[in-house]
């Protein structure tokens, strides 16, 4: 009897394991669907867009989200930080009815090698600023065509501000304006300033352990 129960248990666990693997595969490869944009009363906004999509950029499939209450709005291409750190999921807890998507059509693009645009077969030699600038241009051209815009806005955060600056430097005619959040200007100098601040703070608070580590 114990042997039979053991066999049944192993069989059930195997079935559950296969089902979980199947669900994981579906989650990874399904085009998926975002929650629709809703007004303050929880009613879906008519004509709004909330989608997850993929197009070929720079010779590979790259993923992005587009969200807007009105497709006629000006378009923003958001460049996340990292490199390699898509940020849309972090925005959800802070979303209000006065969200950016009320006034703009926002494209949250997962850059080459990040999030939905990750692929283990990516050639490491393509992971360059030059290629990512070209990817940004192609993503921009897609948005201009789709929403019938001559120019769009470019917004970057952290690493995305560097990518954004390099992009508008090369393709200024594509953009109405650039918005930098946590703008990178001189990374080495920024790190020197941060180091001096941390060391001074550790000394003032008599944190000998931190001082020892920082002075190595």
What are these model-derived regions, one by one?
Residues 88, 111-127, 189:
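Glycine-rich "HGGG/HGxG" loop immediately N-terminal to the catalytic nucleophile
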Residues 156-160, 164:
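Gly/Ala-rich beta-loop-alpha elbow adjacent to hydrolase catalytic centers
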Residues 3-35:
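N-terminal type II signal-anchor transmembrane helix
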Residues 131-151:
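Conserved acidic catalytic loop of the alpha/beta-hydrolase fold
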Residues 90-107:
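Short amphipathic alpha-helix adjacent to the substrate-entry channel of hydrolases
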Residues 73-82:
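Short beta-strand element of the alpha/beta-hydrolase
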Residues 164, 173-216:
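A catalytic-pocket lid/entrance helix-loop region that shapes and gates access to the active site
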């Amino acid at each position: 009897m114990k042997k039979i129960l053991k066999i049944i248990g192993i069989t059930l666990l195997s079935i559950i394991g296969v089902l979980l693997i199947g669900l994981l595969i579906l989650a990874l490869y399904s085009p998926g669907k975002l929650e629709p944009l809703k007004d303050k009363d929880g009613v879906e906004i008519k004509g709004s867009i909330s989608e997850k999509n993929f197009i070929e950029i720079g010779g590979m499939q790259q993923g992005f989200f587009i969200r807007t209450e009105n497709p006629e709005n000006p378009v923003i291409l958001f460049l996340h930080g990292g490199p390699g750190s898509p940020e849309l999921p972090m925005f959800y807890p802070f979303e209000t009815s006065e969200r950016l998507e009320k006034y703009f059509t926002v494209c949250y693009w997962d850059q080459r090698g990040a999030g939905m645009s990750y692929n283990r077969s990516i050639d490491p030699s393509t992971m360059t600023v030059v290629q990512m600038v070209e990817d940004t241009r192609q993503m921009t051209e897609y948005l201009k065509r789709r929403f019938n815009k001559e120019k769009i806005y470019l917004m970057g955060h952290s690493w995305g501000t560097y990518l954004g600056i390099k992009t508008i430097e090369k393709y200024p005619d594509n953009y109405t304006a650039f918005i930098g959040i946590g703008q990178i200007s001189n990374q080495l100098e920024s790190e020197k300033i941060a180091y001096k601040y941390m060391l001074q703070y550790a000394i003032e608070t008599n944190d000998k352990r931190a001082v020892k580590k920082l002075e190595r």
